[in-house]
Amino acid sequence: MLIYIDANLAQYCADHKDFIFGGNGVPPVNEPKLLRELEALQQIVKLEQLGEGWHVPAPKHLMKELLCKPTNNQRGVYSILLRVWEKAGQQEANDADEETITQIEQSLYPLKLKDKDRRHLAEAIALGAVWFLTNDESLINHTRPPKFRNHLCNVQGVYVARPSECIPEISRGLFLNTDQSD
């Protein structure tokens, strides 16, 4: 399963890697909404270990944004993300399809997303991601009709969600995959 992590979440992962990846159980922040999403990222990492493996892409456009002004800690985590993506053999396929990404990006104009958000979502769609995880409330609101702001919505095959919103679905998917393998 391909999970596209928006730039803001990639930065949180880098800044709080010890908490998210299980090395440190002490909550790194006091702000309740951010803490909920960091705990959800921590749970997603634990769920990944139960599944058949997930891919988190590191396309050029995302990496360019992440590497604008990273801290040393962020730079280290981003280099790991890029190495894993390249090792999975996904980088070549991603780089070759700029025309498709541009077409998808144009189809997203009616959503009135910020340029960077539209580009990232178009990349996620072009790569065949199942999830586009973000903590950007504006992005989430622009991809959900007003009556459905509290529901998961699919944008051209990709669910745009906060980490905390995707856990029930990912858990259910793992359960169904495990149940079918018996």
Task: Give the residues covered by each predicted segment.
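Acidic, PIN/NYN-like endoribonuclease modules and their adjacent C-terminal/linker elements
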Residues: 2-4, 17-18, 22-29, 110, ...
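A short helix-to-beta-strand connector/capping loop
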Residues: 52, 86-89, 153-158
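Noncatalytic, typically N-terminal accessory segments of nucleic acid-processing enzymes
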Residues: 1-2, 8-26, 84-86, 93, ...
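PIN/NYN-family metal-dependent endoribonuclease catalytic core
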Residues: 5, 10-73
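Short, aromatic/basic amphipathic alpha-helical patches
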Residues: 71-84, 142-152
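A short acidic, often aromatic-flanked loop/helix-cap motif at beta-alpha or helix-coil junctions
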Residues: 64-65, 91-102, 163-172
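Active-site neighborhoods of divalent-metal-dependent phosphate/nucleic-acid chemistry enzymes
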Residues: 88-133, 137-141, 178, 182
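A generic local structural motif
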Residues: 42, 118-120, 146
